[in-house]
Amino acid sequence: ETTKIFSLFYKVQDYFKSYMDTSSLLSLEFRRFIQEGKYKKNQIAYFDRNSNKATIQNKKIDITNYTQDVISALYACRTIPNEEIIINDTIFIQVYNLEKKEMFNTYFVPIKKEKIKTKLFGEINTIKCHPHVQKNRIFSDKDETYIWVTDDQYHVPVKVETPIQVGSIYIEIIDAENINYKF
């Protein structure tokens, strides 16, 4: 969501909800509510894991056993064991694109281990990752998105930086409640 001042020029309120199987972390349902300037769109995708089909607005497409939505993909990546994360190695993920109603293959690359300072956690050891982000109305064609995750078994995303069509987005966790995690 954009700040009040920025909203005077270009309001962005995008909400994503992912319902997933808690053991496999595979998508069962994905909801996307978009407001970007004057553009508005609400979409829901249902994933039938028994028939390997995804449905959106009565259109069915084939999916694989490993197809994710953008949120469940992040959770699935967090389960990769530390010993399988190799700096500069490419990790591939298949994601369902609601807007185009199709599958696309994407990837991310762990670039380096880095100690960063955050408002909530202070100095923390992280792995800086470079995910491939598809160009759209918000994201520019510059492939310069970075995500920092904790360098531990949990891989908590603590910071994101990405260029957009009209500037850049910086995301950082500034508060957390009811978590059982020691940084």
Predicted features along the sequence, with ranges:
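Acidic, serine/threonine-rich low-complexity disordered tracts
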Residues: 1-47, 85-183
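Hydrophobic, well-structured mid-protein blocks that either form specific transmembrane helices
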Residues: 38-84
